[in-house]
UniProtKB/Swiss-Prot annotation:
One of its GO terms (cellular component) is cytoplasm. This is ATP-dependent RNA helicase DDX25. A motif (Nuclear localization signal) lies at residues 100-114. Belongs to the DEAD box helicase family. The gene is DDX25. Residues 311-478 form the Helicase C-terminal domain. ATP binds at residues 143-150. CDD domains: SF2_C_DEAD.
Length: 483
């Protein structure tokens, strides 16, 4: 695990002070000594360069998607209502409660159970009968991370592969190298008893000479490399593809060039090819892309139960500067019982400063930001889940999708604002939504400067919720706070 250090321009003295305390931050038991001001050593021997970090942390959709895959330990029981729009509304709508009802090949059923699946998830109940239907049906599906979406389309690919035919028959596009590998691992695990079915990766670094005879039946890759393999190197004959999967469509269109490359690949597929598209969200741009690339689809949408603030008590504390904010935070910590807490900062510099202050005062703290690799983030979140650190300080990279049951308090050390310096309502909602999870009650504290009070009032009006002022010096008032 890397130990991170960020350089600021707050002056050499403060920088030196921060450097001295930051080396054992992420894993306190690992005292990484001798850190230079310009570089930070990782445990694996590599080095992180320090950069200016007064900017807001940018949320990377692909990285967050991979992170959610890495930290899921089991299927999530979705709180969404599944809505199915059939291509032919008059045809009967089937769902299944067991995998046996799907009449799968014995080796596939063994693979599913070996992976730990006991019964289909809510999404799988509706999607699998469509994906495995004869003749094949196209599908556009919305699915949150952790609901078994990848397993569902992998099952569809493995079901339609003819192991005796030694050429690519199933093609899956993913937006990144890492996400492609994650999908491939699911193929390899589910297909472990399908002895004659193999997977190949069309990803950067996997250089295959032009004219090579590709004999593996399932190809998983990124759009650019797949396009090169199909049209330039002639490694894949798209007219022989039986199943085409486009995964993470919302991430795909967020990456320059991938949308056009994906459409070019899809247009070379035969009309009888089954086409499946998955996306976590369905903004207008994603929906327009999906309709362009998937002809005559069935559609599965999720009607999300609204994130509610009703079970979260919200407070604000007026402060003069960040030291006042920290003192108020200490007073709150001294007055109420806290399980685990997530503290959000707008910039990496503030996150680093706050982390060092809390470490100096003996708190068990970990720091999460966009500068860490996805594996490092996953490790930090797992440690936080395991209770090894009680406080997670983060930027917006952790604002959504990460559920830790023990979190009882969320602190906005900085209010979330957009580039126009207006309140970022959606980020606020997802930040404080990290507490009050799973039907439990939670607390949210906003540390704000006086000139930011109008922004907070806009947030209060927007959500039609009450945000009460708290006097951080009144310990009696703090001690009366209840969940």
């Amino acid at each position: 695990m890397a130990s991170l250090l960020w350089g600021g321009d707050a002056g050499a003295a403060e920088s030196e002070r921060l450097n001295g305390h930051f080396s054992n931050l992420i894993h306190p038991q690992n005292h990484l000594l001798g850190i230079k001001s310009a570089t930070i050593p990782n445990i694996d021997g590599s080095v992180n360069r320090i950069e200016e970090d007064d900017e807001d942390d940018v949320v990377d959709l692909a990285a967050n998607s991979l992170l959610n895959k890495l930290i899921r330990q089991s299927l999530v029981e979705s709180s969404h209502r599944v809505e199915v729009l059939q291509k032919d509304p008059s045809s009967p709508l089937y769902s299944v409660k067991t995998f046996e009802e799907l009449r799968l090949k014995e080796e596939l059923l063994k693979g599913i159970y070996a992976m730990g699946f006991n019964r289909p998830s809510k999404i799988q109940e509706m999607a699998l009968p469509m994906m495995l239907a004869h003749p094949p049906q196209n599908l556009i599906a919305q699915s949150q991370s952790g609901t078994g979406k990848t397993a569902a389309f992998v099952l569809a690919m493995l079901s339609r592969v003819n192991a005796l035919k030694l050429f690519p028959q199933c093609l899956c596009l993913a937006p990144t190298y890492e996400l492609a590998l994650q999908t491939g691992r699911v193929v390899e695990r589910m297909g472990k008893f399908c002895v004659d079915v193999q997977v190949m990766y069309a990803i950067r670094g996997n250089r295959i000479p032009r004219g090579t005879d590709v004999t593996k039946q399932i190809v998983i890759g990124t759009p650019g490399t797949v396009l090169d393999w199909c049209f330039k190197r002639k490694l894949i004959d798209l007219t022989k593809i039986r199943v085409f999967v486009l995964d993470e469509a919302d991430v795909m269109i967020d990456t320059q060039g991938f949308e056009d490359q994906s459409i070019r690949i899809q247009r070379a597929l035969p009309s009888e090819c089954q086409m499946l598209l998955f996306s976590a969200t369905f903004e207008d741009s994603v929906w327009q892309f999906a309709e362009r690339i998937i002809p005559d689809p069935n559609v599965i949408k999720l009607r999300k139960e609204e994130l509610t603030l009703n079970n979260i008590r919200q407070y604000y504390v007026l402060c003069g500067n960040r030291k006042d904010k920290y003192q108020a935070l200490c007073n709150i910590y001294g007055g109420i019982t806290i399980g685990q807490a997530i503290i959000f900062c707008q910039t990496r510099r503030n996150a680093k400063w706050l982390t060092v202050e809390m470490m100096q005062d003996g708190h068990q703290v970990s720091l999460l930001s966009g500068e860490l690799t996805v594996d490092q983030r996953a490790s930090i979140i797992q440690r936080f889940r395991d209770g090894k650190e009680k406080v997670l300080i983060t930027t917006n990279v952790c604002a959504r999708g990460i559920d830790v049951k023990q979190v009882t308090i969320v602190v906005n050390f900085d209010l979330p604002v957009n580039q126009a310096e207006e309140p970022d309502y959606e980020t606020y909602l997802h930040r404080i939504g990290r507490t009050g999870r799973f039907g439990k009650k939670g607390l949210a504290f906003n540390m704000i400067e006086v000139d930011k009070l109008p922004l907070l009032m806009k947030i209060q009006d927007h959500f039609n919720s009450s945000i009460k002022q708290l006097d951080p010096e009144d310990m009696d008032e703090i001690e009366k706070i209840e969940y």
